């Protein structure tokens, strides 16, 4: 049994779960690229999401940044890859 303390908060796990759901929804639809999900959070609020596009490009991170209308300064990105 491990004695290491979990380094991820419940909020981190919550946002990563959303990113995983985004990735899973594109399984098999992204060509040779992996299906990836991305969630951008700022001040405990989701400000953007992204997924790997059909046929694999653009990538999830690019899509999330492109779709974001808020300032990204101070935000955190959760990515499944």
Model segments located where?
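Secretory/periplasmic and organellar redox-cofactor proteins
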Residues: 1-5
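Short, basic/aromatic recognition patches
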Residues: 8-31
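Conserved hydrophobic/aromatic pocket- or pore-lining residues that grip, position, or stack substrates
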Residues: 19, 37, 44
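Generic detector of intrinsically disordered, low-complexity, polar/charged segments
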Residues: 25-28, 34, 47, 53
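Acidic, glycine-enriched active-site microenvironments
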Residues: 31-36, 73
């Amino acid at each position: 049994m491990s004695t290491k303390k979990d380094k991820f908060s419940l909020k981190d796990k919550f946002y990563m779960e959303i990113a995983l759901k985004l990735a899973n929804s594109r399984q098999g639809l992204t060509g040779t690229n992996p299906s990836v999900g991305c969630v951008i959070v700022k001040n405990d609020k989701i400000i953007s999401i992204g997924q790997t596009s059909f046929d694999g490009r653009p990538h999830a991170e690019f899509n999330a940044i492109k779709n974001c209308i808020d300032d990204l300064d101070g935000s955190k990105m959760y990515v499944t890859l």
